[in-house]
Amino acid sequence: MNRVSASADDRAAGARPARDLVRVAFGPGVVALGIIAAVTLLQLLIANSDMTGAWGAIASMWLGVHLVPISIGGRALGVMPLLPVLLMVWATARSTARATSPQSSGLVVRWVVASALGGPLLMAAIALAVIHDASSVVTELQTPSALRAFTSVLVVHSVGAATGVWSRVGRRALAATALPDWLHDSMRAAAAGVLALLGLSGVVTAGSLVVHWATMQELYGITDSIFGQFSLTVLSVLYAPNVIVGTSAIAVGSSAHIGFATFSSFAVLGGDIPALPILAAAPTPPLGPAWVALLIVGASSGVAVGQQCARRALPFVAAMAKLLVAAVAGALVMAVLGYGGGGRLGNFGDVGVDEGALVLGVLFWFTFVGWVTVVIAGGISRRPKRLRPAPPVELDADESSPPVDMFDGAASEQPPASVAEDVPPSHDDIANGLKAPTADDEALPLSDEPPPRAD
């Protein structure tokens, strides 16, 4: 009975990691596929359309969640919403973090990462096959590039898997390498700076929508149906991170563009923009002086980076290196977001931000303002002053002690004179002529004579 229960426990323990790996491989992708299928079928039912090409549309939208451009009727939709992508990265990071523990071995970590990448790649291959099959029925639907599809899926899930695994075993991995210990603090400072920049830019975007409320109502007026207005609201929510990234670019001194329309903190060039309510937040010419104050957002994000770097005081060189690593990491993250949030938008042209100026702007604010914050917050530790050795004390000739023979221990251990005088001579000394004490001598009585009686 005990053997049967032990074998059952072993099988259950072995099945647990297998279930975790399957969940990591297909969990986020299957959940996204289910949501996309429900939304697509609901739209087809509301539009009273047939289900022809429904599976091709579902597969195209699943690839679109991974920033794969969709081509319909010869027109490319390259500007994909960032919100589904960020949710996919978060779901992948969460699943990998749950399957990994701080004590996981390297083999377990490799299996988790391989599962997080292998499952989505398999689903991408199936989606490409479904789209290719549906394109024979729906001629307007075009199969995307396989290389672009696999690359986008791999990058999105790699970012999520790396984030989840790093949150569990990052410190242990750093301790096992020759990299400095403050590298983890630099990553945290970069994350704080990016979140501060995006969060404050989101607040500015919301405030701009309130200011341009009339323009937003006009954009909602392009449709009279409730379902159409609901669809515009959903699209605005999905594309809100794209607009926030554009606002962040403007806040650090870069620019954002929608076709020929260009927006920055110093000038606005007009042009046609899509009728999307979230785009009502874009500034309109002539540009007021309040938009120049948007640069305060970039400075505030630099303060957030400096505060995180100053939590652990380091010497000058190490503190500077930690801040530079955080600034470079934050600039790279913003560049990736700017690249992912842009693309080709049909007849409107290219949509996105000036990525080169965005990287330079983030580096400037994170480094300059961050360094000032580190200095003020006490993030630089001073080296202790070296104590000068005390000068030797010179003794006078009168105060000098006589030399002591350190190697002759018998000289310092001679018995006192009184002890040496009280010791009686031995038989050898008497034989050599040494006179032994007699009873008449004023000395101690001999041991064989009785002591004298007092009269």
From Swiss-Prot:
Q: Membrane-spanning regions, if any?
A: 26-46, 53-73, 77-97, 111-131, 146-166, 191-211, 232-252, 256-276, 278-298, 323-343, 357-377
Give membrane topology per the record: Multi-pass membrane protein
GO terms under cellular component: plasma membrane
User: Does the UniProt entry include the keyword Transmembrane?
Assistant: yes
- Does the record bear Iron-sulfur in its keywords? no
Q: What is this protein called?
A: Uncharacterized protein Mb0980
Instruction: Note the Pfam families from the entry.
Output: DUF6350
First-listed, main subcellular location of the protein, grouped into a coarse class:
membrane
Region annotated Disordered, chain positions: 384-455
Where in or outside the cell is it found? Cell membrane
Record keywords: Cell membrane, Membrane, Transmembrane, Transmembrane helix
